[in-house]
Amino acid sequence: MDRTVAFAEELLTRRSGAQVRLADAEDLGGSTRSRVVRVRVSENPFSLPRSLVVKHYLGAPDQADGTDRADPFPYEAASCQLFTALPAEDRATPTLYANDPERRLLVLEDLGRCSTLADKLDGDDPKAAERALLGASRALGNLQAVTAAREGDFGALLRRSGVRHWRDPLADDARSALAEVPDLLAHLLRVEAAPAAVAHARSASSLLGGTEYRAFSPSEVSPENCLLTGAGARFLDFEWGCFRDVALTAASVRLPFPGWGRAAVLPTGMAEAMAASWQSEVSGVWPELADPTVSGPRHLAATTLWVWVCTRTLLPGVVGRGAGPDQVVVGRPTERAAAVLASYWRRLRTDADRQHVDAPVGLADAVVAALEPYGGDEPLPPFPAFSRCTSRP
């Protein structure tokens, strides 16, 4: 931690041209790839705030991730630069104060000791949890609305960091899932995916290309990385920030939160309310998305891709065949993994039934039934805040 603070002091001093001192370092955690530290600015010749957050990527770029994926640091740096350039009222992220690509260091605004969305879901106030979910969904929609025309800016920022061809990890994983899941279902669950169901899933890959509905996405949306500040929800952690079709982001909220991997469910109707909050923001940019005949099939396609990606990751472990492939966008439940996976397929069935698309309905029914011997029929508990609710509070 001392090394991280020393690097941050040196960076800020170099940027300001006068000595900056940092003190009282507090470890905020991080991941296997990075360390996150809160520091007090004890010697401040200019107008830096009283405290800052420093994120330091550990190891060399080719050691930062145990997979064959690209280095995540340039993606987070470009994401923070993109949002810092926006007007303050459009910025749903911390401000970036300094960035050192060589030492893989970011110095960010300290948003304070706020509750996270995860804290509200794990609390005991259903009304507060509902407000937090709807506020976060609305903030996510606004984040996408204000970045709708900025993919070129994001690409330019990545190129300045040496990234010539940027990738969306969900798109990579989805293409692999579309190729592999039919065989996985057949070999591990003895479920034969009908040709119509496979064709429907593969048609959803149209969302992975250059659609007209692309905007910034944090890559995986986790309640642990959503701070609830006095100015509204703020998002953290853009290690794989990217541009993708907005339906894919909305679907990840409705599942809910496959990147978090919590074995819990939302009250009946909450997913739809969250989608409506998100849509109220993006429809200002794309008015046609307020039309269910336009948005409905797109949400179904996005849900299909997410469920297939989650199946590729989780199914081998569910049936005792070892862990599936590691994926940036899918969290592994620590318990009730079969029930979590079954809940994703039920969500897909619900969406397909509403769109009167039969092929995914039949496949979802077969998968849910095949997961029962592994615990797929075990009821998932509600998030603690909703433990006394059967529907929206």
Region spans (language model):
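ATP/Mg2+ or Mg2+-diphosphate-binding catalytic cores
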Residues: 304-393
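Conserved NTP-binding catalytic cores of kinases and kinase-like/nucleotidyltransferase enzymes
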Residues: 1-102, 195, 229-233, 352-393
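Conserved short submotifs of the Hanks-type protein kinase catalytic core
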Residues: 103-115
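Active-site acidic catalytic loop and adjacent metal/ATP-binding pocket
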Residues: 29-53, 201-248
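Conserved kinase catalytic-core helix
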Residues: 114-155, 201
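Active-site activation/catalytic loop segments of kinase-like enzymes and analogous catalytic loops
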Residues: 248-287, 302-323
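Active-site catalytic-loop/activation-segment of kinase and kinase-like phosphoryl-transfer enzymes
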Residues: 1-4, 155-205, 282, 346-356, ...
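AlphaC helix (C-helix) of the protein kinase catalytic domain N-lobe
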Residues: 76, 80-83, 140-143, 253
